[in-house]
Amino acid sequence: VNTLSYKTKSAKASDIEPKWFVIDAEGEVLGRMSSRIAHVLRGKHKPNYTPHVDCGDFVIVINADKIRLTGSKMQQKEYISHSMYPGGQKRITAENLLVKKPTAIVENAVKGMLPKTKLGSRMYKKLFVYAGAAHKHEAQQPEPFKF
């Protein structure tokens, strides 16, 4: 009996060849799109996915300023930050954040769906979000990602 035939193969970092994907966020629902992006950044869409290895792909998100939130979340959803000084809590609605920094909503949603470890930080660095339709990664020849 060949014992190697029924053993699980773990992917090595040297074996993985990352691809580049571009996603158009225009008209997409924030949470659904973000979970798919996190799925690709982790590498779970690949058959050789290994939890302890960064086997994810690079993702470019364009038109992040045209993202869609369902219901009345655009006016009611609040992003809270704190300066660590007394009384330093700041709140901003999704509507105002979209005007102030359009990429922050997508970045925040995807970051929350990735592991909170060193590996998760490495995965997050493979995400590039742009407010407009133009991006500076044409040299990598990204292919459109189909949902």
Feature locations, PLM:
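Ribosome large-subunit tunnel/peptidyl-transferase-proximal elements
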Residues: 1-107, 118, 136-147
